[in-house]
């Protein structure tokens, strides 16, 4: 079992999700701490005690790092009790278990998708109650879109906001996206009400946008790719970065200058 990102140097190469998570951590982007358990590692009471000591929580979010193809892929991102009875049955031969700090995706303040190209970054966002996966899978149109040049223009007097291009979903489009999100959540077994969503979309506050532009600058300088996406969220007033993708899927490794 490896505790990440602290033990990054011990991770075997070629683990797509883990590679991109560690790349973002290396660049100073905030990520959840996590633990990686191989498919052939026994999960025992001592394992659970070590995890409880590390996470200091009673629950974890479980994701899966596939190490071989599977005809029955398992959907990750769900929360489980950090107990032997809950975690041990999740282990299977096709995946490594990837346990992260718990997050309630229904309480996300924003889901953010960053599309990097050679000369610009397109920031797509959805609001409270939505998830960045809604954007990545094309299930929901963005509620707010911001385009910035690369490198980010700051201006002579730090008037960076003047150089951004903004667009927003209409109120009708926003309400329709709530209907679609509720349909998706119902199909996943969640029971939710419209109260988890804002009646109107609230644009990203300018101070958070300024922080995000700082991360964008850092990523654009150091990730050696021409066209890629970065997924992030804001939860409990904090940024969390998830992974990096290219248009043809996640790469095995990403070069860092």
Where are these regions (language model features)?
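Nucleotide/phosphate-binding sheet-loop regions of phosphoryl- and nucleotidyl-transfer enzymes
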Residues: 1-257
């Amino acid at each position: 079992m490896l505790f990440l990102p602290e033990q990054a140097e011990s991770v075997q190469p070629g683990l797509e999700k883990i590679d991109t998570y560690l790349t973002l951590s290396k660049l100073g982007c905030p990520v959840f701490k996590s633990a990686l358990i191989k498919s052939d590692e026994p999960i025992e009471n001592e394992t659970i005690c070590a995890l409880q000591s590390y996470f200091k929580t009673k629950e974890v979010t479980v994701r899966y790092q596939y190490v071989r193809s599977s005809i029955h892929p398992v959907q990750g991102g769900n929360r489980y009790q950090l107990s032997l009875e809950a975690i041990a049955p999740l282990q299977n031969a096709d995946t490594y278990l990837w346990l992260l700090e718990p997050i309630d995706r229904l309480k996300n303040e924003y889901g953010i998708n960053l599309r990097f190209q050679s000369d610009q970054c397109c920031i797509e966002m959805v609001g409270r109650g939505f998830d960045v996966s809604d954007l990545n899978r094309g299930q929901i149109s963005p509620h707010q879109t911001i385009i910035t040049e690369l490198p980010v223009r700051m201006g002579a007097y730090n008037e960076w906001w003047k150089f951004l291009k903004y667009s927003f979903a209409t109120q009708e489009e926003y309400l329709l996206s709530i209907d679609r999100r509720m349909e998706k959540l119902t199909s996943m077994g969640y029971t939710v009400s419209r109260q988890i969503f804002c009646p109107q979309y609230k644009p990203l506050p300018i101070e958070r946008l300024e922080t995000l532009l700082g991360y964008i600058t850092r990523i654009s300088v150091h990730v050696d790719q021409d066209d890629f996406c970065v997924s992030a969220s804001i939860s409990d007033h904090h940024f969390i970065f998830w992974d990096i993708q290219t248009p043809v899927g996640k790469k095995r490794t990403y070069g860092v200058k």
